[in-house]
């Protein structure tokens, strides 16, 4: 075993922690607006303390147009009024500390909102000092610079006729990618992170962080050539306190890459979310909507591979649910008569491995997937997929079956606090 791991002084508090992810919109509404809020989280801290958690991973609460449920940030240093005020956030941090519950913020450093002041300035002219905060290519407005596709569907380029250029976005057109080759842009992000560290935040979940080293000219998005250079600089500049925990979302990570991310010298990140086990029920070479039955020996081999691969030279994050995934009880268990037994079995597997467990709101209750009419879904990914597949002539019942099985809104329904109307989540309309 690595001497670095044997030296307990290099261990972080997070290596013996359990984190609980909260999706604020659907956790608890205290105002009757139908949307969860920060005060609702503060009200339930005693419940969370009784669960035995060490920290809360809080999905984005920054100011945002909410095109992608807060993952399109328009102000990194402001709370969206949808969730409350800065005073509400400060109260949550302070009350959490009283209960030894740390607050971990979900931060998007790969892209921002097209309503962020940086982008509003950037598209005014090519000479604007914020122009190079983003990725641009000249063009005629008819043919995009290349054939890259956005993750939510459609081209990865959108044209701005006022300046005769296309900007790059891996997700929605309202989420322009930030240009990490620009030192001024990087420093602006680091200042925003320090703002929250100074307020008492003790860690960050970094959304699609493996994308920041992208090179659209080479059609490279994940694990780009300068990725680890950027991560080391980010860690040194923004996460310099030893107690700050960082977990990076890295869909393309394998064990060897994860060793670089989570090496014990903490020069990059504390750990990463990798998704190899999550893809085992997806048909090879197809989209996430195209599923196949999970073969249990494959899951066992995958989990063992990561446990053995990072033992002594990195650190595993452990999860089966989050805001982007269907409920695991419905996915890999039996959400009918064996719902409770399935939930307990899956929890035993999760907490029996080496690593830091992350549980998602309602996971402790064995919450399940839902089936709604298409008009009641709100997730941009679901709506785009439905539109594209229906346009291709797919049968609606097949499209809806895929949404029921894999849609992200499965995880975003209200937390079930009681058996009363709206599950005790709100006195209004969810």
List PLM regions with ranges.
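Active-site and adjacent substrate-binding regions of carbohydrate-active enzymes
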Residues: 1-430
């Amino acid at each position: 075993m690595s001497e670095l791991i044997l030296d307990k002084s290099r261990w972080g508090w997070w290596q013996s922690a359990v984190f609980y992810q909260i999706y604020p919109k659907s956790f608890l509404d205290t105002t009757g607006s139908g949307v969860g809020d920060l005060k609702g989280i503060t009200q339930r801290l005693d419940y969370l303390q009784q669960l035995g958690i060490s920290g809360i991973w809080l999905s984005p609460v920054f100011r945002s147009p909410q095109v992608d449920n807060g993952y399109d940030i328009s102000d990194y240093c402001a709370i969206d009024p949808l969730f409350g005020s800065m005073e509400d956030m400060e109260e949550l941090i302070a009350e959490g500390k009283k209960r030894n519950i740390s607050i971990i913020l979900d931060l998007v450093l790969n892209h921002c909102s097209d309503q962020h002041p940086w982008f509003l300035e950037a598209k005014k002219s090519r000479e604007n000092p914020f122009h190079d905060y983003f990725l641009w290519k000249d063009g005629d407005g008819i043919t995009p610079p290349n054939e890259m596709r956005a993750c939510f569907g459609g081209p990865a380029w959108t044209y701005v006729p006022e300046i005769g250029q296309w900007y790059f976005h891996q997700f929605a057109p309202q989420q322009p990618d930030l240009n990490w080759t620009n030192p001024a842009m990087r420093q602006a992000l680091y200042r925003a992170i320090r703002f929250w560290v100074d307020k008492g935040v003790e860690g960050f979940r970094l959304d699609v962080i493996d994308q920041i080293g992208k090179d659209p000219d080479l059609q490279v998005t994940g694990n780009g050539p300068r990725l680890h250079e950027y991560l080391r600089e980010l860690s040194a500049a923004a996460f310099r306190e030893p107690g700050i925990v960082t977990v990076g979302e890295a869909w393309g990570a394998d064990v060897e890459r994860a060793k670089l991310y989570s090496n014990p010298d903490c020069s990059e990140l504390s750990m990463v979310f990798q998704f190899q086990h999550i893809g085992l029920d997806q048909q090879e070479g197809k989209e996430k909507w195209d599923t196949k039955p999970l073969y249990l020996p494959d899951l066992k081999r995958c989990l063992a591979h990561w446990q053995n691969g990072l033992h002594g030279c990195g650190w595993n994050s452990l999860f089966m649910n989050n805001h982007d995934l269907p409920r695991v009880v419905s996915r890999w268990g039996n959400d009918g008569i064996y719902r409770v037994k399935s939930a307990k079995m899956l929890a035993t597997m999760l907490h029996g491995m080496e690593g830091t467990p992350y549980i998602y709101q309602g996971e402790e209750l064995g919450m399940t997937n839902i089936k709604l009419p298409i008009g009641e879904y709100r997730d941009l990914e679901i709506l785009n997929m439905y539109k594209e597949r229906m346009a291709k002539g797919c049968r609606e019942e097949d499209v809806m079956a895929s949404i029921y099985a894999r849609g992200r809104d499965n995880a975003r329904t209200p937390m079930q606090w009681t058996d009363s109307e709206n599950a005790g989540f709100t006195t209004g309309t969810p």
